[in-house]
């Protein structure tokens, strides 16, 4: 009943802005956006300073993407690198077990984890992420299980997803931090630049963890494209919400 009331209430909300614009077009919007960026990323740099760094990183990422694409152009023409079938991961559980063995010696060791993989209910799959790690409780007992949700309707590369959500991504990250016995205040802070940044960073190890050369090459192609796309989205986010780009400017930038 509560969820139905929420759904009904959301349906009554009417947009007051007919233009597609960022928060910079609202009073105090630029300051608000700058505060959000610094708070969520955990940095002191201004949005424009961040955009400058992103732009430089974009150039490097594009050159890397171009080099990899040229190196594996035959694979790009014949294989679907956006939906790779990994022999090491016939199931999500098998993939996690495999990754657990591959991070040894690369990342600090942690205790053996209990974890359960759940399927996202059919009614929630539309719009749900490819997967989600459900953050464990602060006082989680040794015999309690970590939980990862998998969306079977999502098209994507399972191994990269398992790296991001499991080993050595979110599940590993949270378990490792709990093992350090940090003050409880650490668990109350909210800095997505730290938590999500770590998981995205670990995706760069996916190809390194693989044995099959074709899977490795396809993963490198997919990762290079993802890296460039992430930087593109981050750069345009700043331009739209800090510098007032409208739709036409965004479109022109993408067409360059």
Model-predicted segments: where are they?
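N-terminal maturation segment of proteins
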Residues: 1-256
